[in-house]
Amino acid sequence: MKTQIPVFTEVKEKEICADESGAYNFLLEGDNLHSLYLLEKTHKGAVDVIYIDLPYNRGKTDFIYDDDFVVTEDGFRQSKWLSFMKSRLILARQLLSDKGLIFISIDDYEIATLKMLCDEIFDPSNFINIFVW
């Protein structure tokens, strides 16, 4: 990836269209950080809803994706997770429209830490609620 610049490539077979109105939606596959940087160039301030299912930072490997982001015994585990999340949430904030919403899935293990990070990035006055499901 050091020598390659990520680019959007449209795949017509994967086009998402609800009806014939011409409304266009798309699915972006790729590394989330690189994808967010690309979206910032094309969709800054234009996204109404973002849903993120984060790594829960539990060190588990029984999820569909690898949640063992940082070695469990690492003394800087939470700090590394916060740095990982902060860069992505800052980019997500840049994508949101003025009335945009972000929904974030997390478990009880990191919810307090995530809430403080979101307050820093999105401003506490923008917080609406926690949905437990």
Q: Which residues make up each language-model segment?
A:
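Residues embedded in well-ordered beta-strands within globular domains across many folds
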Residues: Y51, F131-V132
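Conserved Class I SAM-dependent methyltransferase catalytic core
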Residues: Q78-F131
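Short, glycine/acidic-enriched loop or turn micro-motifs at the edges of active sites
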Residues: H34, Y56, E110
